[in-house]
């Protein structure tokens, strides 16, 4: 039909272009219908990895087709009129009739044989007297034989549809299993992240407590030295040889006082840094760890710890 825009090839048609030619060369006497069955069985036996390049090529052809024909809509051809005298298809619609007989699914992954029907129409145009729909095994004899052949063709189409539906079910089950495995892996990664972050928080809190204890012990030692100073004064009065040390004591007191102030400033600054780091880490965890948005008991525990540290 002139002016008719062909549908883009699906993955099976892309794959079968070369395979059909090879199979026809290896088996010159094999009929078109048998070749199509063999190709369908081989296509089903391919793995998803082996099919993926052909699906990608089919998607590319579909994109080019959409760009070339932006207003294209699929319109099935009208069924061909069969001559009452001979049962011969008219030349102009021969390929359309053959195509519609086995075009049982519009799914892009379904098996279609459009190229075969175009080839059959070409053969018919070369020899109109001998073309009797042999590629699809449509008999032109007794009506009972025609009904039997139609029932056989319908049964084949039903079997193909069942096989295709079963393949889709298996693929959906495989995809669901993969998604379930990915979700399980994600849950494990999230749990590992929680455990690692919790361990880091505990270690940092323990280190902070140790630093606080060391600072407290040092401050206590300084206070003890300050309380011992009156006793040292009494020893000075009892021992004249320590007179020079007594004169230097006010300067030492000032140094001790300055040192005590520096220690206090260091303690305050270090404590403020620890609180800020703890607060920043807690905010980072609350924003990134729990992607589901739920408030976990562990987050409540960290929030209470943060409040105690700040207060």
From Swiss-Prot:
Acetylation of Lys-81 contributes to its nuclear localization and enhances its interaction with KPNB1. Deacetylated by HDAC3. GO terms for cellular component: cytoplasm; nuclear speck. GO terms for molecular function: calmodulin binding; DNA-binding transcription activator activity, RNA polymerase II-specific; RNA polymerase II cis-regulatory region sequence-specific DNA binding. Signal peptide: none annotated. It is found in: Nucleus speckle; Cytoplasm; Nucleus. Residues 142-151, 222-235 have a biased composition (Low complexity). It comes from the Eukaryota. SUPFAM superfamilies: HMG-box. GO terms for biological process: cell differentiation; positive regulation of gene expression; sex differentiation. Its main location: nucleus. Belongs to the SRY family. Transcriptional regulator that controls a genetic switch in male development. It is necessary and sufficient for initiating male sex determination by directing the development of supporting cell precursors (pre-Sertoli cells) as Sertoli rather than granulosa cells. Involved in different aspects of gene regulation including promoter activation or repression. Binds to the DNA consensus sequence 5'-[AT]AACAA[AT]-3'. SRY HMG box recognizes DNA by partial intercalation in the minor groove and promotes DNA bending. Also involved in pre-mRNA splicing. The Gln- and His-rich domain may mediate protein-protein interactions. Interacts with CALM, EP300, HDAC3, KPNB1, ZNF208 isoform KRAB-O, PARP1, SLC9A3R2 and WT1. The interaction with EP300 modulates its DNA-binding activity. The interaction with KPNB1 is sensitive to dissociation by Ran in the GTP-bound form. Interaction with PARP1 impaired its DNA-binding activity. This is Sex-determining region Y protein. The lineage of its organism: Eukaryota, Metazoa, Chordata, Craniata, Vertebrata. The gene is Sry.
């Amino acid at each position: 039909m002139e002016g008719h825009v062909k549908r883009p090839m699906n993955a099976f048609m892309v794959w079968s272009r070369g395979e059909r030619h090879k199979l026809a060369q290896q088996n010159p006497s094999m009929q078109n219908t048998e070749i199509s069955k063999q190709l369908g069985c081989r296509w089903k036996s391919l793995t998803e990895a082996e099919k993926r390049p052909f699906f990608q090529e089919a998607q590319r052809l579909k994109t080019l087709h959409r760009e070339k024909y932006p207003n294209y809509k699929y319109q099935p051809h009208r069924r061909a009129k069969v001559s009452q005298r001979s049962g011969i298809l008219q030349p102009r619609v021969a390929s359309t009739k053959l195509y519609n007989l086995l075009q049982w699914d519009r799914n892009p992954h379904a098996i279609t044989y459009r190229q075969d029907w175009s080839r059959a129409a070409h053969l018919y145009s070369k020899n109109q007297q001998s073309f009797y729909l042999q590629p699809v095994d449509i008999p032109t004899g007794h009506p009972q034989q025609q009904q039997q052949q139609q029932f056989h063709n319908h049964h084949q189409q039903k079997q193909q549809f069942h096989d295709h539906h079963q393949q889709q079910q298996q693929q959906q089950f495989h995809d669901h299993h993969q998604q379930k495995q990915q979700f399980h892996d994600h849950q494990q990664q999230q749990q590992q992240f929680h455990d690692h972050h919790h361990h880091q928080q505990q270690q940092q809190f323990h280190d902070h407590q140790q630093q606080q204890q060391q600072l407290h012990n040092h401050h206590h030692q300084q206070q003890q030295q300050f309380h011992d100073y009156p006793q040292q004064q009494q020893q000075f009065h009892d021992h004249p040889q320590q007179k020079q040390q007594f004169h230097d004591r006010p300067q030492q007191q000032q140094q001790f006082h300055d040192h005590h102030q520096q220690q206090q400033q260091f303690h305050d600054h270090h404590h403020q840094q620890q609180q800020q780091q703890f607060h920043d880490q807690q905010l980072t965890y609350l924003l990134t760890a729990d992607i589901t948005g739920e408030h976990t008991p562990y987050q409540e525990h960290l929030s209470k710890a943060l409040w105690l540290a700040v207060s």
